[in-house]
């Protein structure tokens, strides 16, 4: 079991157990710690991206109280690993920023954060990895378009980013290498068949709940959707980006800061659009043909990325 199930959330729980807490208390404290890490990561990321502590606070509240975040704790019960993976999403992006500005220290932080994501929940790491690569690519692209950015720095950014990802896989190898080596002795077929086949869990017109108060009932997967308040907030944020932030974006005194700000806004728009698309039946061709994606099982797992 431990060769196939990401162990980090179990390690966190074990720490509290070793400190003398009961099993139930240890799980509850691990959940509390996950909330704290997620909130801090979202706050730090938004403050860095938008330069405002108020933006950080608003983002931390929105991310921490996102319906899918709550569902993983209070409804699914067995999703402590996936819950902890959401805590690492903002940390990974925050560390990715540091690859450019903090040299080798930034590379080490990205390696640690990404390894933490892999060890938290391998399926969530699979889901989030394309978005991480997109963000790194946008950073490189925008830096490359800046005449004030030396080419040697762009080369170093690429090398450090690649090295950080390789180091992250090396740090997490003790978990996923045995899992890959022993997959022949595990019955992996049933995890993508029957109830667990992705085609049974798409969301279309029911992607967003219609009541102001989120309905956490498990009937017909009602809880695996966006909340109405969350959807309205997301639409308002997208509108602000499209009609206010992007048109009025001005190059700062340091041109590279302006181009990176544009990358972040573009990343937010693309990530939200792609994550939402992957939850709907329109994405079925991708689910059928992209390797390993079927092991995600539930398209609504992209709600975790959408929440960010």
Where is each model-derived feature located?
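Membrane-embedded helix bundles of polyisoprenyl
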Residues: 2, 17, 29-49, 53-140, ...
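Membrane-water interface of alpha-helical transmembrane segments
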Residues: 24, 28-31, 50-53, 104, ...
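Juxtamembrane segments of multi-pass membrane glycosylation machinery
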Residues: 8-33, 293
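Periplasmic/ER-lumenal interhelical loops and adjacent helix-loop junctions
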Residues: 164-248
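Membrane-helix boundary/interfacial segments in multi-pass membrane proteins
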Residues: 69-84, 190-225, 274-308
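Membrane-interface helix-loop-helix junctions at transmembrane boundaries of multi-pass membrane enzymes
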Residues: 143-161, 238-276, 281-285
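Membrane-proximal lumenal/periplasmic loop motifs of glycosylation machinery
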Residues: 1-7
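Hydrophobic membrane-spanning alpha-helices of multi-pass integral membrane proteins
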Residues: 90, 131-132, 168, 233-238, ...
């Amino acid at each position: 079991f431990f060769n196939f199930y990401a162990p980090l959330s179990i390690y966190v729980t074990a720490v509290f157990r070793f400190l003398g807490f009961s099993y139930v208390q240890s799980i509850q404290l691990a959940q509390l710690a996950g909330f704290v890490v997620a909130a801090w990561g979202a706050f730090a990321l938004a403050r860095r991206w938008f330069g405002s502590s108020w933006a950080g606070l608003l983002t931390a509240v929105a991310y921490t109280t996102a319906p899918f975040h709550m569902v993983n704790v209070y409804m699914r019960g067995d999703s402590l690993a996936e819950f902890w993976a959401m805590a690492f999403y903002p940390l990974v992006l925050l560390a990715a920023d540091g690859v450019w500005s903090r040299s080798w220290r930034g590379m080490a932080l990205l390696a640690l954060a990404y390894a933490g994501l892999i060890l938290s929940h391998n399926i969530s790491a699979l889901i989030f990895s394309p978005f991480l690569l997109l963000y790194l690519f946008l950073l490189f692209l925008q830096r490359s378009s800046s005449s004030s950015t030396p080419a040697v720095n762009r080369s170093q950014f690429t090398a450090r980013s690649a090295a950080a990802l390789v180091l992250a896989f090396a740090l997490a190898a003790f978990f996923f290498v045995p899992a890959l080596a022993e997959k022949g002795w595990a019955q992996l077929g049933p995890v993508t068949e029957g109830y667990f086949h992705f085609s049974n869990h798409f969301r279309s017109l029911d992607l967003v709940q219609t009541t102001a108060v989120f309905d956490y009932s498990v009937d017909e997967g009602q809880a695996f959707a966006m909340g109405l308040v969350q959807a309205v907030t997301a639409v308002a944020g997208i509108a602000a980006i499209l009609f206010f932030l992007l048109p009025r974006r001005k190059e700062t005194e340091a041109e590279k800061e302006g181009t990176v700000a544009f990358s972040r806004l573009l990343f937010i728009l693309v990530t939200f659009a792609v994550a939402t698309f992957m939850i709907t039946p329109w994405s079925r061709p991708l689910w059928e043909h992209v390797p390993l994606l079927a092991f995600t099982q539930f398209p609504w797992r992209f709600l975790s990325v959408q929440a960010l």
